[in-house]
Amino acid sequence: MAQTQFLITNQNNIRSKEDQLIIQHFLQEYEKNIVPISHDLHRAVIHNDGNDHNVIVNKNNRAHGIIDFGDMVHTYIICESAVCLAYLVINNPDPIDLTSELIRAYQKVFPLTELEISVIIYFICLRLCISVTMAAYRKQLFPDNKYITVTEDQAWIFLRKMKRVDLQRWSDQVVNKTFH
């Protein structure tokens, strides 16, 4: 998900200057909070598009498989959780509890370090920035394709809210709820 170059290059596809500033804000957060510690984050090939449209469930509503491997990439392992969470938190009234709950479940299968968990919010916001920027780009190419914008409005609402939040405090709360 370290597709910051895509954001830098394509943010001009976003029509609102105010929204472009939101993208720039989260790029700065990434530079300030992720780049200095990036060498300490584990990397692997990840699916990179875990959302409710890409999970196959059986008749008992249990996950049976995943589809859409077109976004697979070698990147930070924490991004797998961040991508899934990005689509869950945008409509959740308590994203901190939801994030902690998902991370605790993930920890049972694939343990993450405290450092990785502490930076997940930056990756959640970055994923949503990529999502809205990609939507702006693709809308120009395929104006009749409504799927392109399926989460765009909710993502912008979440990003605007998170721009006003102390992300370090948010991160500390997630770490505390995950480990205590």
Labelled PLM ranges:
Residues 59-63:
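Active-site beta-strand-loop-beta-strand hairpin of nuclease catalytic cores
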Residues 123-124:
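Transmembrane helix-bundle signature of multi-pass membrane transporters/permeases
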Residues 2, 10-14, 131-180:
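ATP/Mg2+ or Mg2+-diphosphate-binding catalytic cores
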Residues 67-72:
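Activation of the activation-loop gatekeeper triad in protein kinase-fold domains
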Residues 78-111, 127-142:
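Active-site activation/catalytic loop segments of kinase-like enzymes and analogous catalytic loops
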